[in-house]
Amino acid sequence: MSGPSSPSSTGHWDSTTTKPPQFAPRSHNDVYPFILPKRFRGALKDKVTIITGSAGTIGQALAECFAVAGAKLVLTYNNTPPPTTLKERCVNLGASDVSFVKCNVAELKGCEDLVKQVLQTQGKVDILINNAGANSLGLFDTQPPEAFIHELAVNLHGPYYLMRLLLPHFKSQHSGCVLNIASRAGTVAIPYSTGYCASKAALINLTACVQKELDVDKLNDVHLYSLHPGGIKSVMTLTSQILPLLNLHPPPSTHSAFTQAFDTLYDDSPYLNGMTCVALATGLAKHVLRGKYVDVGQDLEDILAQAEAIKSDENLYALHTSFLGGLENGGTGAGEKPGDGLKKSAEAEGGKEGFEFPGF
């Protein structure tokens, strides 16, 4: 996408401007031309790919998309195994191999056993997709602590365990990709979903922090991403999940409108997330988006066309806090250095720089 107000497809901009121009990426709720499966057929042939939470809607779609790309699939589940037809579907789509492994990612021992088994049987791991998730809706002060702790264990501890176990392997082979399925809930505050929001926010920042460490070591071929998979109808997003809350909030007169709005929020195809993950796993965006938070509903081609804009602003596609007047997170204003504010205050008072407690 290019035009009078858009950067070229190479991501360059007029050097006379202070900042690269930006335009809003196109929005999608289904697979679009840039990530069509036929473009990636066989692109990940024989790449050993672990997908956690493979029994759910998002997990099955991920498996099918990576099958098209020719990956060797290791599909994990905990309580509910994937449907028996999933293996056949994936093989028919082009998967190099498909195996199922029972694993509770909330437990370190389970993650250790999984990694050991995969390395013994496959000899390597190329791609890790942390997709398993848990969400226990409820009032924070009445919800059992066990529910909150379980959400942290599945949504944060599990990805941490597997990343921690596989990172030395990725470093030694100088390649590897981690796709952490986070959520937009990790970027906003949502009532009655405290554990989910908190754990997903932590997952987004965990991804960014680990990528920073890899970049320091110039291990750019080990690339990590956190993603909002879109609004997808699944067991976790059924309106029945929120019915207990409607007995408390909001008032009964708004229940119908509330449930209808809840339904319309979840109309994205799970294959939109699946094919975005395939595209990222090939490395086509690692020069721009590694370590970043990606909303799969945004056109990836449009994002890549603005590579320079993203590189010039570390707050893009990242968790970010804003303050009044452009005050930066380090406590300084735009163009200021730490301590400048104290100097200004002292000058205004006609005194010296500095302050002696308690000052009266």
Indicate where each model-derived feature is located.
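Conserved glycine-rich cofactor-binding loop
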Residues: 48, 55-56
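Conserved glycine-rich Rossmann-like NAD(P)H-binding loop of the short-chain dehydrogenase/reductase
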Residues: 69-85
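Substrate-binding pocket helix/loop in short-chain dehydrogenase/reductase
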Residues: 139-152
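Active-site loop-to-helix junction immediately N-terminal to the catalytic Tyr of the SDR YXXXK motif
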Residues: 143, 189-197, 209
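C-terminal helical subdomain
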Residues: 7-34, 226, 246-360
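Residue(s) in the substrate-gating loop at a strand-loop-helix junction
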Residues: 183
